[in-house]
Amino acid sequence: MRCPFCRHPDSRVVDSREAEEGAAIRRRRSCPACGRRFTTMEEASLRVRKRSGATEPFSRAKVIVGVRKACQGRPVRSDDLALLAERVEETVRSSGSAEVAAEDVGRAILGPLRELDEVAYLRFASVYLAFESLGDFEAAIAALRAESAGGGEPPVAGKPTTMPAATGASAVIVPVTTGPRAAAGP
């Protein structure tokens, strides 16, 4: 590492520590030429691949802006949005890939947002999942109700989910998509 003071091409690492809850490494360095010390931060880059094929750095701020629109008029604090964005980044980074699809970021938002506020979840899901009809909303609401009643994850559109019935038997709930998308298939 080049010394920022004397431009000597080499430096020695004196100390290394985790920073930003393990997302980065803080290194204290010493220059053998001038003897001055300086700090560097190392962080693995995470890039998001958009539908157009272009890539850009992952941004918690963009996650917050997108989710804030869904939360307008809802009792959701800025701190809650910051924590949600942090959880989304942790989820996306846990994939181990340096580049993730924008769709994966959207999917990572859905779970924490559902826990935070169901109305905001429906608003976000309606845009992210491209709801086209009232039936899409009804299916999403039915999935949320099923989750509340059964305490489990809501079904994914078009994917059957087995829920225990009161009689001990099981019922299969399949969210139905109506309109032009229904003919296209999953």
From Swiss-Prot:
Pfam families documented for this protein: ATP-cone, Zn_ribbon_NrdR
PROSITE patterns: ATP_CONE
Nucleotide-binding is among the record's keywords: yes
Location of the region described as Disordered in the Swiss-Prot/TrEMBL record: 149-169
Signal sequence, start to end: none
Zinc finger (unnamed): 3-34
Keywords, ordered alphabetically: ATP-binding, DNA-binding, Metal-binding, Nucleotide-binding, Repressor, Transcription, Transcription regulation, Zinc, Zinc-finger
Ranges in coiled-coil conformation: none
Residue ranges constituting the ATP-cone domain according to the UniProt record: 46-136
A GO MF term: DNA binding
Listed cofactors: Zn(2+)
GO biological process: negative regulation of DNA-templated transcription
Co-factor remark: Binds 1 zinc ion.
Family: Belongs to the NrdR family.
Function: Negatively regulates transcription of bacterial ribonucleotide reductase nrd genes and operons by binding to NrdR-boxes.
NCBIfam families xref list: transcriptional regulator NrdR
Protein name: Transcriptional repressor NrdR
Organism of derivation: Parafrankia sp. (strain EAN1pec)
Gene name as annotated: nrdR
